């Protein structure tokens, strides 16, 4: 009996260690940059809709209520045209405490979106917008809908047992994909579901056409890498969104959902070309090469 008791005691200790390690890891990974920290002494207000818990400073109540309406509209549109949005409440924080135009989304420990309300005035990549709040809320909500997805049995069981663990496969397979995929999908839908968006603008097209003509066009693997060289942080947004635009124009807009579901359902993760073949019938690497050649030929024809 003592041996059995010792076993249970060791298991209990191990369980406590795992829980503590997970807690500390989650805190470390969830630590946001200083610019993203909101003032805790603000006079915050919160309202709830069917799918969102919207928080905002008291003086921005009109904007907060408008953001709630935009979010619900985008939620319905994405559920109809992309994939089914996740259940449960999504936290949406709207703030103007810093002079920055941005937003970010996270799926751990719950689905959360933060929006910086200042509209962009100095970013050429964000020059083609109609309504900043509509564009940025739609973009960040796409991240939630996309990255929350886990269709493989291992992931569903793991999340049921361990909760929303911070990590890619099997918990959140989409978070383990390159940025040209995550940002490309969100940028494509921001353009498809609003009156503007970066796919409809000319800046990203100019970036890629110039790269193709000058022999600097990057393959899709390189497009996710960080570099101080122009176009710096624009790279995954421009390459990703316009490559998906190429794929969906060629193979059909319904293929985006099939691609996301293929990644979310993989038993052996990180096989992007396999997911591409499942969804589009082609290898993404090979199709990316053909796409680059098309852009080169188009650019040269305009230059002649």
Stretches found by the model and what they are:
Residues 217-240:
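Catalytic-site signature segments of enzymes, centered on catalytic residues
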Residues 74-79, 181-194:
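An active-site-proximal "capping" alpha-helix that borders the catalytic cofactor pocket
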Residues 188-218, 253-261:
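Short helix/loop segments within enzyme catalytic domains
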Residues 1-17:
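N-terminal secretory signal peptides that target proteins for export/translocation
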Residues 141-157, 185, 191-203:
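Catalytic Zn2+-binding segment of zinc metalloproteases
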Residues 36-178, 226-229:
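Juxtacatalytic substrate-recognition/specificity segment
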Residues 19-32:
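Bacterial N-terminal signal peptides
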Residues 37-48, 52, 72-73, 231-235, ...:
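Beta/coil-rich, acidic/histidine-enriched accessory regions frequently appended to metallopeptidases
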């Amino acid at each position: 009996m003592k041996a059995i008791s010792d076993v249970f005691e060791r298991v209990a200790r191990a369980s406590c260690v795992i829980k503590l390690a997970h807690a500390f890891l989650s805190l470390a990974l969830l630590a946001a940059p200083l610019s993203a920290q909101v003032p805790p002494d603000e006079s915050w207000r919160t309202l709830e809709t069917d799918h969102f818990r919207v928080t905002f400073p008291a003086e921005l109540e009109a904007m907060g209520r408008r953001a709630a309406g935009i979010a619900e509209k985008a939620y319905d549109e994405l559920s109809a045209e992309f994939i089914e949005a996740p259940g449960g409440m999504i936290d949406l924080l709207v703030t103007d405490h810093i002079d920055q135009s941005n937003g970010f989304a996270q799926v751990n420990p719950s689905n959360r979106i933060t929006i910086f309300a200042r509209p962009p005035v100095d970013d050429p990549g964000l020059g083609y917008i109609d309504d900043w709040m509509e564009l940025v809320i739609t973009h960040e909500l796409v991240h939630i809908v996309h990255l929350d997805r886990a269709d493989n049995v291992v992931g569903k069981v793991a999340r049921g047992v361990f909760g929303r663990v911070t990590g890619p496969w099997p918990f959140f397979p989409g978070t383990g994909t390159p940025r040209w995929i995550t940002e490309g999908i969100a940028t494509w839908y921001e353009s498809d579901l609003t009156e503007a968006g970066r796919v409809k603008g000319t800046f990203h097209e100019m970036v890629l056409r110039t790269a193709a003509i000058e022999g600097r066009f990057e393959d899709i693997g390189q497009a996710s890498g960080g570099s101080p060289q122009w176009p710096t942080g624009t790279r995954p947004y421009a390459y990703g969104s316009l490559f998906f635009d190429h794929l969906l124009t060629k193979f059909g807009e319904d293929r985006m959902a099939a691609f996301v579901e293929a990644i979310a359902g993989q038993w052996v993760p990180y096989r992007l070309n396999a997911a591409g073949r499942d969804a589009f019938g082609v290898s993404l690497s090979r199709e990316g090469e053909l796409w680059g050649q098309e852009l080169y030929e188009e650019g040269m024809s305009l230059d002649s």
